[in-house]
Amino acid sequence: MPTINQLVTKGRKRKASKTKSPALNQSYNSLHKKYKKLSAPFKRGVCTRVATMTPKKPNSALRKYARVKLSNGMEVTAYIPGEGHNLQEHSVVLIKGASVKDLPGVRYSIIRGTQDAAGVNKRNQARSRYGAKKAKK
């Protein structure tokens, strides 16, 4: 435990908060070849690999994910939500920071219904999350 004198001379250091989605917090300037700290809600990228992985212990499934090379040069793993998808290698996608609890290392989620990622077919509830159009009557 520090003495009062130590606290007066040095003081307490503020603990820096760690971001949950670091790839969204920097942009790349290709002209000057430098990274710039710039927070963004979404980032565009190109799929380099589309595959499945199994979740952590109590759950059992084959979760779809894509390895995405972002516009700032970073490569991240992003989850593909919803049932069925049309993504393949070289598909252009938009990602957001949304961690998947039972997939370790997956901190991002692909936004359905934008760029090359088509919306989920025959979806009636929570349609805006999955880029689904309203069903015709």
Curated annotation (Swiss-Prot):
InterPro entries: NA-bd_OB-fold, Ribosomal_uS12, Ribosomal_uS12_bac. One of its GO terms (molecular function) is tRNA binding. The keyword Ribonucleoprotein applies. The keyword RNA-binding applies. Keywords: Ribonucleoprotein, Ribosomal protein, RNA-binding, rRNA-binding, tRNA-binding. PROSITE patterns: RIBOSOMAL_S12. With S4 and S5 plays an important role in translational accuracy. Belongs to the universal ribosomal protein uS12 family. Part of the 30S ribosomal subunit. Contacts proteins S8 and S17. May interact with IF1 in the 30S initiation complex. This is Small ribosomal subunit protein uS12. The lineage of its organism: Bacteria, Bacillati, Mycoplasmatota, Mycoplasmoidales, Metamycoplasmataceae.
